[in-house]
Amino acid sequence: MNTTRDANRLRQRASLSGLALAGSLGLAGCGVLGLAGCGGDNNSSTSGNVKPSFVGTVTVTRHDGANDDLLTAGLGAAGLASASAPSVATPTAPTAAELRRLDIYASYRALVDTAANGGYGTLYGPSVDVNGNATSGSGMVPGVEYIAYSDDGTGQQNVVLLVQIPDAFDPANPCIITATSSGSRGIYGAISTGEWGLKHKCAVAYTDKGTGAGPHDLATDTVPLQDGTRTTRLAAGRTAQFAAPLTDSQLAAFNAATPNRLAFKHAHSQRNPEKDWGLFTLQAVQFAFWAINDKLGAAGMPAGSPLPVRRDNTIVIASSISNGGGAAIAAAEQDTAGWIDGVAVGEPGLNLPPSANVQVARGGVTLPVSGKPLFDYVSYANLFRLCAASSSGVSAAPTQAFFAGAVGWPASVQANRCAALRANGLLSSATAAAQADEALQKLHAFGWEPESDLVHASMSYFEIDPSVAVTFGNALARASVLDNLCNFSFAAVDSAFHPTAVNATSLAQMAALGNGIPPTSGVQLINNLAQGGPTQSKQSVDGSGALAANLDGALCLRNLLTGGDAASLALQAGIAQTLRTGNLHGKPALIVQGRNDALLPVNHGARPYLGLNAQTDSSSRLSYIEVMNAQHFDGFIDLVPGYDTLFVPLVLYEQRALDAVFANLKNGTPLPPSQVVRTTPRGGTAGAAPAITAANVPNFTMTPAAGDRIGVSVSGGVATVSVPN
């Protein structure tokens, strides 16, 4: 294997491998922005099609299905699979249409393995029909898009809402699927979920949930607009998709002290958007009802006539993956007015309350730790995972060879991190090898399954833990970009790893090609306190004089969980605003997740949520499907050599979950019971695994074997979720 060549290939495509991170919403968000009781006042029987009060100016665009379309932006199934991104006539000044095409291309590929051997075009993808049959078609879907901001009147919120209505939408059998963005992405950040809806003639209700990939470039004071194009903050005014809330004097002082920095909406809006992700999902649904009726001509109907598409005649499924899946569950918990009928989500991020009284047992053995919120376990991983990935027991893990070859990282950085952890009293072993083994065992003890072991190296190589910890730390604490929380900032870097002006082409296209959570599109994490001046975090020398990937910053982030200073208290309060209740109000629901998930470990999300739901939802209809040999990032399967031999695509099970919930709501078909699905990896040679077949990815069943059943019991106020080995 040519490690330098392969690592360069990974870095070139890293901006397409968007992170899908966790998120949820507390009930404190209910009732704001015109949603009475998280339901709103646009009742099924209301005559006239009243635009929701939170919706601003609406733009409607037509996509003909030939040169452009809703699902592939005119690229077709083959274009989405192409390794070459769509061209832009003027790279530093892309048009809105060019950015939309780039966004759909990048977002789809970030979420889906588009390699034919991985199942694209045979098991899933635009050219596979609703019955799972491969076709020779392009998969393009004609229709219209309605897009608008949801705002609270300040121009600071400006959450993007988008509704796609296919021409095939059937008013006699109306359906709506939500597709809240995954990760910190923009509006098309769950396009792979939207695909299912469009194929089934449903409207798709998207929201960027107050995140997005377009930054505020503080050096030039330019900001993204709703369509991803850029202008000055002054010219944008209240139409900016995001502008950091700074005065001119604050900005000037910040630029003088810390030049060439960027602010991102998820991290720096100072609004803790995660607390409102469920609310924004409900707003997207309400906007969808209005948009559909508008397209159907409801404005011209006689007074007193019922609207064609209403809550009482429309199937609405809250869906998405990762952050978006957590948002869908949050919306279903908050929905007291009947906007949502069912839930089908993949790998959702779910923050459980500390008093959940839920325990998880695997193979009859109760696990010592489960049900932690995202920032808790990701800040823990941010300390130990880089060291743990060098354990001899996982030396064959994908990307581990890149560390050994010092490709993109300092030489010996893993051993340096292990030694620094020992110097700080966090490890006790004396040798680098023993320290790595100890760090890996710490991850196991904190909730990561052994099945995640081979994923730790790539999680570390792509800096996923520090990126999540820094962005969520800022967001939860409502930190300003001025605060440089834990002495981190965001900037492009020069050849010496010091901050420099961001590349003009990268900046112009970042709203489409970025993922909203640095490192992304050439924007790096910066250690402001590095020896020798601000330096790219993973390349920095910290206070101890070691190249240990900024352990000082990682320790600072971890300490926010228990600290008593203002930033720590703000973060702790922010987490409390994102906790789930577990009560889905009896809605039929399916959660699917891969057992190998190393980003959102099953023991901190789906498994304990099943127990929380059993305690709080007296009419529960929730089932949980745990898929063996599946992990969080399907986009990595063809990107990272070795993933293809080890992992099956979870997207297939996410679509099957939608099939099952839709059949339940449409025909009364029972949902499958909670179970483990035992898949078969493709095997073969890393980077050249044989083609997947249906035999590799069996469906879940209505009658799982006893050894595959996942059980839930409640006794003495404690729910126990029992998962087989």
Swiss-Prot record:
Transmembrane segments: none annotated. Pathway: Lipid metabolism; butanoate metabolism. Its main location: secreted. GO terms for biological process: butyrate metabolic process. Keywords: Hydrolase, Secreted, Signal. The active site is at S322. GO terms for molecular function: hydroxybutyrate-dimer hydrolase activity. It is found in: Secreted. GO terms for cellular component: extracellular space. It comes from the Bacteria. Its EC number is 3.1.1.22. It catalyses: (3R)-hydroxybutanoate dimer + H2O = 2 (R)-3-hydroxybutanoate + H(+). Residues 1-22 form the signal peptide. It holds the Pfam family 3HBOH. Participates in the degradation of poly-3-hydroxybutyrate (PHB). It works downstream of poly(3-hydroxybutyrate) depolymerase, hydrolyzing D(-)-3-hydroxybutyrate oligomers of various length (3HB-oligomers) into 3HB-monomers. Belongs to the D-(-)-3-hydroxybutyrate oligomer hydrolase family. This is D-(-)-3-hydroxybutyrate oligomer hydrolase. It comes from Ralstonia nicotianae (strain ATCC BAA-1114 / GMI1000) (Ralstonia solanacearum).
